[in-house]
């Protein structure tokens, strides 16, 4: 009897900051009972490890060591969501050696499981280019800034909308123009513009695509 290995069913959700990809990824993971990895947290976790030890953020060797020893299952989103950690993460995320180490860890996470949902910026193009289904979630900068602004207020913190919008545009430019793994949709990704969509509408649109991919995957 011929045996064969079924490839893991990987759902990829890429997109710029505050596009709604994380919210959508968590909803999809819950609906299908799939493990979820927010790959953006891996860069934040590396930055936090350096900050906690009082180490410089511009030392690629130290940052890479932190990346190689990272436990993906021990990341605390609530702690890692702090603004200061996000700022620090943007500095280590541009380091090629750090990116290579984290990409390998993210890839291992996806390939070691029967199914999973990963969201980030380069999952469909770099981490899991052979994923069964790829979504690229986007929205206008103004809509994304409003979402981020509302998130900050909901946490009880203060925020300046104009400052958030400027930061988002700056991050978009940095992400799209970086030499290593620039932010762009994979050629076979399904584009999902959530500028005028509710979370429920975005989920239903994604679910339709995923259900179709699942049916094909199962043959």
Curated annotation (Swiss-Prot):
NCBIfam families: cmk (TIGR00017). Pfam families: Cytidylate_kin. It comes from the Bacteria. One of its GO terms (biological process) is pyrimidine nucleotide metabolic process. Belongs to the cytidylate kinase family. Type 1 subfamily. It catalyses: CMP + ATP = CDP + ADP; dCMP + ATP = dCDP + ADP. This is Cytidylate kinase. It is found in: Cytoplasm. Keywords: ATP-binding, Cytoplasm, Kinase, Nucleotide-binding, Transferase. The keyword Kinase applies. GO terms for molecular function: ATP binding; CMP kinase activity; dCMP kinase activity. Signal peptide: none annotated. GO terms for cellular component: cytoplasm. CDD domains: CMPK. InterPro entries: Cytidylate_kin, Cytidylate_kinase_dom, P-loop_NTPase. ATP binds at residues 15-23. Its EC number is 2.7.4.25. It comes from Brucella melitensis biotype 1 (strain ATCC 23456 / CCUG 17765 / NCTC 10094 / 16M).
């Amino acid at each position: 009897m011929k045996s064969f290995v079924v490839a893991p069913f990987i759902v990829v959700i890429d997109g710029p900051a505050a596009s709604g990809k994380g919210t959508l990824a968590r909803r999809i993971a819950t609906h299908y009972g799939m493990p979820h990895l927010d790959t953006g947290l891996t860069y934040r976790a590396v930055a936090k490890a350096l900050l906690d030890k009082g180490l410089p953020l511009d030392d690629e060797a130290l940052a890479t060591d932190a990346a190689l020893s990272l436990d993906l299952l021990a990341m605390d989103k609530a702690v890692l969501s702090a603004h200061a950690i996000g700022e620090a993460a943007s500095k280590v995320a541009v380091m090629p050696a750090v990116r290579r180490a984290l990409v390998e860890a993210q890839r291992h996470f996806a390939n070691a499981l029967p199914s999973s949902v990963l969201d980030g910026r380069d999952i469909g193009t770099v981490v899991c280019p052979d994923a069964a289904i790829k979504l690229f979630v986007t929205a206008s900068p103004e809509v994304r800034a409003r979402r981020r602004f509302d998130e900050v207020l909901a946490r009880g913190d203060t925020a300046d909308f104009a400052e958030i919008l400027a930061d988002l545009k700056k991050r978009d430019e940095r992400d799209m123009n970086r030499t290593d793994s620039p932010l762009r949709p994979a050629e076979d990704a399904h584009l999902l513009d959530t500028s005028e969509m509710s979370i429920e509408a975005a989920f239903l649109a994604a679910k339709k695509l995923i259900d179709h991919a699942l049916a094909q995957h199962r043959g």
